[in-house]
């Protein structure tokens, strides 16, 4: 699961990457737990079916004088003969067993099968236990692994593998013909990222009363027709105002787009792609502001808004490379449609319109953007990022 999670979100894997690292850290933890200054505050349980580790812990607790604070734990139904010997040698053993109602007995079997599957993987001690004797090949393999872990216990890295910091990490630029890679989502398990977005949302809550104009031919236009945007969490309050377009202004926008499309369509694939890559970089730069805008404008949870920003960035980079893949131009002549109107919904106010705008622009079209009237403030963040690009 950890591998899947890391791969899906573009994060470092949270646990160690190899069994050897896990084994070395286990020895480090044994030493830490058996230190008298630590052991006196807890009842320290050593859970394992590895005889090398169990015996190592027995010797360690005797050496450190913490016998009463360190106990041993094993699973019922798995190497019971080994458990009996450990119980006698350690003068006690905590034995775990699943307890279920009779009609749920299959759940207990599933639990034990899962444990058995984990513990009998090729590198695990139980994999070799039943055919192992001192001096045998499997014994020597396990002995070598144990000694290697002991040697590396003070060298193995400990602490979080994930260090993402949205407040400090630099924005990673991308360029035309770079290999596509999904934008990394925000790792909300990290305190610094939670503090970062809390600050963004707090700053957004201080804003109110903005007036969002129409923008046609580079000119900001206000009208006598105003709509109001509301924060779903404070629905009785007007959060901001936005200008409606009348029929003449709609016509003006279409004429402007028609006039601009030939200039835009004349750009090469590489030129258009670089602009979309710059747009992706701008969207990445305003991730925090965009998340806070969606929280204010659409009632999105930060976790939901964050993946929208990632998807929007991915759209820009993906479409930037879409017309230059192998085979795309073999015997095909492509031409723009002309002017595309992108009309976006309220429930995905960031990713969907960004994808529509990016795809239309990359195909050489002019774009008229008409967002949902329930998410105009979010759309305002998007268009400004594209204009800066």
Regions found by a protein language model. Name each.
Residues 1-3, 51-56, 62, 78-83, ...:
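Flexible loop/turn segments at secondary-structure boundaries
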Residues 43-49, 73-75, 96-98, 119, ...:
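Generic beta-strand/beta-sheet core signal
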Residues 1-179:
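Positively charged, amphipathic and often flexible ligand-engagement surfaces
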Residues 36-40, 60-70, 89, 265, ...:
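Secondary-structure transition/capping motifs at alpha-helix termini
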Residues 16-24, 45-48, 73-74, 245-248, ...:
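Alpha-helix capping and helix-loop boundary segments enriched in small/acidic/polar residues
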Residues 295, 316, 321-389:
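Rossmann-like NAD(P) dinucleotide-binding subdomain of oxidoreductase/dehydrogenase enzymes
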Residues 91, 102-255, 259-262, 266-281, ...:
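Terminal low-complexity tails and localization/encapsulation signals of metabolic enzymes
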Residues 284-290:
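Extended, amphipathic, non-transmembrane alpha-helical segments
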């Amino acid at each position: 699961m950890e591998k899947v999670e890391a791969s899906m979100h573009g994060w470092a894997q949270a646990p160690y990457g190899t069994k050897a690292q896990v084994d070395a850290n286990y020895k480090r933890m044994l030493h830490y737990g058996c230190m008298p200054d630590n052991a006196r505050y807890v009842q320290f349980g050593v859970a394992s079916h590895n005889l090398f580790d169990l015996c190592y812990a027995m010797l360690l607790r005797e050496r450190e004088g913490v016998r009463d604070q360190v106990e041993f734990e094993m699973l019922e139904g798995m190497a019971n003969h080994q458990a009996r010997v450990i119980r006698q040698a350690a003068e006690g053993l905590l034995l775990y067993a699943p307890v279920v109602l009779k009609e749920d007995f299959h759940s207990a079997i599933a639990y034990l099968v899962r444990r058995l599957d984990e513990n009998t993987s090729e590198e695990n001690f139980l994999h070799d236990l039943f055919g192992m004797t001192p001096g045998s090949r499997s014994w020597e393999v396990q002995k070598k692994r144990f000694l290697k872990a002991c040697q590396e216990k003070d060298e193995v890295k400990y602490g979080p593998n994930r260090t993402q910091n949205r407040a400090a990490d630099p924005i990673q630029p991308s360029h035309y013909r770079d290999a596509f890679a999904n934008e990394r989502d925000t790792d909300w398990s990290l305190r610094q990222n939670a503090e970062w977005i809390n600050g963004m949302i707090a700053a957004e809550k201080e804003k109110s009363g903005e007036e969002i104009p129409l923008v046609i031919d580079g000119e900001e236009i206000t009208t006598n027709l105003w709509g109001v945007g509301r924060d779903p969490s404070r629905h009785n309050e007007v959060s901001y105002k936005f200008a409606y377009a009348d029929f003449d202004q709609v016509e003006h926008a279409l004429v402007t787009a028609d006039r601009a499309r030939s200039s835009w369509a004349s750009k090469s694939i590489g030129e258009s792609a670089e602009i979309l890559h710059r747009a992706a970089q701008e969207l990445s730069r305003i991730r925090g502001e965009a998340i806070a805008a969606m929280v204010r404008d659409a009632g999105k949870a930060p976790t939901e808004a964050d993946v929208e920003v990632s998807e929007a960035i991915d759209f820009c980079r993906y479409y930037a490379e879409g017309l230059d893949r192998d085979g795309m131009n073999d015997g095909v002549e492509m031409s723009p449609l002309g002017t595309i109107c992108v009309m976006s919904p309220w429930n995905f106010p960031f990713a969907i319109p960004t994808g529509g705008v990016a795809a239309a622009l990359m195909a050489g079209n002019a774009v008229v953007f008409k967002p949902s009237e329930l998410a105009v403030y979010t759309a305002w963040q998007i268009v400004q990022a594209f204009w800066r690009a």
